Amino acid sequence: MLTLSALRWGKPYKSLEAQEVVHFDTGEPIAKIGNVNGGMLQLDMKHAPRARAVLREIPPSDLLERCKKAADLFENGDLPVGDGIQSVDDFIHQQSASTGLPEHMCRSNMKKNSFVLANMDKILAALTRGLDLNIFTRGHGEEGRGVTVSYQCQSPVLGAVLPNNSPGVHTLWLPAIPLQVGLLLKPGSQEPWTPYRMAAAFMAAGIPGEAIAMYPGGHDVGQTLLTRCQRSMIFGSAQTVEQYAGNPRVQAHGPGFSKILFGDDVVDRWEDYLELMVESIFSNSGRSCINCSGIWASRHTEEIAKALAERLGPVDVLPPQDSNAGLAAFTNAKMATGTWGMVQQDLQDSGVKDMTAGFGERLVERPYCAYLRPVIAHANSPECPVAAKEYMFPFASVVKCSQKEMVNKIGSTLVCTALTSDPQLIDALTESVHVDRLNIGPIPTNRLNWLQPHEGNLTDFLYRSRAYQIAALG
């Protein structure tokens, strides 16, 4: 059984306080995490400037090559993790056992993280609009148009309070290292595997350990991190996002409320897009902010909801080792029962119909965990509260709404796939400040182009553009 220790700028620290990580289905311990408190993090912040300093000593081109090597090690290598050596299969088994995700989904998320790291040169070229990365090192330089540009680093480290439930979100903090900004992470208690393995891969690839810190612990650690770091990110609920709204130091990531919109010019051919809808709702067991939670159309909505229910309603629980397993467990059974209670309340509202009611019980309870099978609801109006809901399992509402009202009614939407060729609808969505990622045409909401920014551009978050003038001394 592995013991994971805090990393104090690359150096393991053996804590006297350990927390067990248990198997979601058996309750058996699979690892121990040595917890620390916020006081240690606060004390160690005095070394944060060194994290950026050691990265600035390495040319960006070399950092990008080391990222490629780290990507290969992360996906294929045996790495020192905690007090043991972790193989790829060990990683997959451990992550599945503690998060409840089927093993094939863990493998898929692993490949996604590796892909982003291996293609970091292309991703940063896109996010910086082709800027020479040496300008970030020096702080200024020529952009190529005879214009001096300057970018001021806003923090020597990027802090991140990481989640328990979704290994895919780790792609968001990976660019910090090649941008010569250190990492200060609070790993999730149920999903410490990705940050620890990634840290090991980085260091094995030649990234200085002094640039990476890991502080497992309670809420005080997360709060200290967010208070002390000049730039940090946190993953949580809609309330978390609201709490940090307007705080320029914190990038808060929450529910996506991602949607598929049918234009009136396409909706009569809705059957052509059934597979797209199923994938958008069901991929990664519906756990991601990029999963579709709402399908909006002016007509055929009950037919669409019925077809989705017929596809997803029969999906049942399978063992996590099964390559056909489509549902992730709620490792906290009370969270599943609480979520199901909220869903039941939504389904009882006027104008709402449970389209999966005829496909058996949705809540599946086990001794140590629980599952929620897919739910498809039909809402005859965007005013139904269910039209604005998102849950951590395959759940979607099919909403009847006129095309002219859609853009004003959909609300906050991380990913919007618009199935239309109507120039007016496309222009309205393009101008909407409520839509982040916009897909025009048949692109599932869960398929991201990593050459595009996701929930903001990390380079703009870590670096501020400023004036920088130089004149020769007489």
Located regions from the model:
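N-terminal Rossmann-like NAD(P)+-binding subdomain of aldehyde/semialdehyde dehydrogenases
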Residues: 1-144, 314
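Short, flexible loop/turn motifs enriched in small residues
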Residues: 11-16, 153-154, 166-169, 369-371
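Conserved C-terminal structural/oligomerization subdomain of aldehyde/semialdehyde dehydrogenase
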Residues: 23-36, 58-75, 207-209, 278-279, ...
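Short glycine-enriched loop/turn motifs at secondary-structure junctions
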Residues: 25-29, 226, 254-255, 288-291, ...
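Structural signal for hydrophobic packing residues in well-ordered secondary-structure cores
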Residues: 52, 56-59, 67-78, 99, ...
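Rossmann-like NAD(P) dinucleotide-binding subdomain of oxidoreductase/dehydrogenase enzymes
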Residues: 129-279, 453-455
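ALDH superfamily catalytic-core signature
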Residues: 204, 229, 237-381
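A generic structural motif
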Residues: 213-216, 253-254, 319-329, 421, ...
